[in-house]
Amino acid sequence: MSIDYEVVYQGKVSARLESRNNKRNNGFATMMQQFNAKKYLNKRMKLSAFIKTDKVIESTGLWMRVDDKYEDILQFDNMSNRQIKGTNSWNIYSVVLDIPEQSEVISMGILLNGSGKVWVDNIKFTNVDLNIPSTNMSMERNLLDEPINLSFED
């Protein structure tokens, strides 16, 4: 992770994450911040940034998570359903999450899975209207009403 003065979208600097080619492409890097959710309770917040990539093999993207005081995840999006791969020019990306009343902590950043380079610039965290759809990745499970096949014969 470093500051880059040459590859920028706007202004004088961008941030760069880089993972060198290695035999195991299962590593990841993240640049993140974590802060108190109190100021944002009952709001819909959008994390947006301009992202540029070079030879990203696995994926990269923004991510945001909202936790309660027990560190349970209330809202989450890591763009895994809309991954950025390969080599791409500057483009704007965003994640949008609701900040429920019981929220305590907001974590957010950019993630690089596998090898490649990613630059991020012009990051914004803004309150948006409810007509902007949430990108929350549902963590709900569809549970059965009762146990089944306890004899393993069905």
Task: Give a label for each model feature.
Residues 1-154:
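Extracellular and organelle-lumenal recognition/adhesion modules and their flexible linkers in secreted
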